[in-house]
């Protein structure tokens, strides 16, 4: 089969779903490439988008494919009274694709690994779609080795790893890679304990920041306590 991929959001950041889809089809012996236009025939084309139409307008469906599959959070976000909502039709990737190690070769311009080792968040912030999409309990979904193939930098996409009951295991897995770790999502200072700080201090940290989603929360004491043991 000839498989075409369309990253509707553009190529400013690797699309994890498309990387897994590519890995799955290549493992089956299919030819996978970025969709090249309507001059070429494709057996199947995948269109994926993370962001809503407000940020990533949809693209016309290919006319030269036997089948087109459109997926990703961006196709299921709707605006109501100025607020984004996720509809109930959103579906995860099939387990046989979700379990694939990402195919980094489709994004050669990026030399880092990306990982999503836990999903869900207990905070349910009104501006965030993680809780309705992934649940209000942070839970481990993968090991770091399922994403990392020796890259010197790992960008961690976990929405709230500090809320995960398996965070000790996950943080130490990241540490043990010896790679530079970049937490792309804010860590939750309210859930950080001494063991967490020790694990963070033992990593090669490229970037770390904290989510302060409710300005009415007085977290000054938490930040003062953290600063005394802050990561180097």
Give the label of every model feature segment.
Residues 1-70, 74-77:
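A short, structured N-terminal alpha-helical element that caps or precedes a catalytic domain
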Residues 15, 43-45, 57-58, 77-88, ...:
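Short, charged, surface-exposed secondary-structure boundary motifs
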Residues 37-43, 62-65, 108-109, 146-151, ...:
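Flexible, charged surface loops at secondary-structure boundaries
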Residues 42-45, 126, 152-154, 206:
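Conserved acidic residues
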Residues 66-102:
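Ser/Thr/Gly-rich flexible loops in soluble cytosolic domains mediating phosphotransfer, phosphorylation
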Residues 107-146:
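Canonical Radical SAM [4Fe-4S] cluster-binding loop centered on the CxxxCxxC motif
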Residues 147-232:
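Conserved SAM/AdoMet-binding glycine-rich loop
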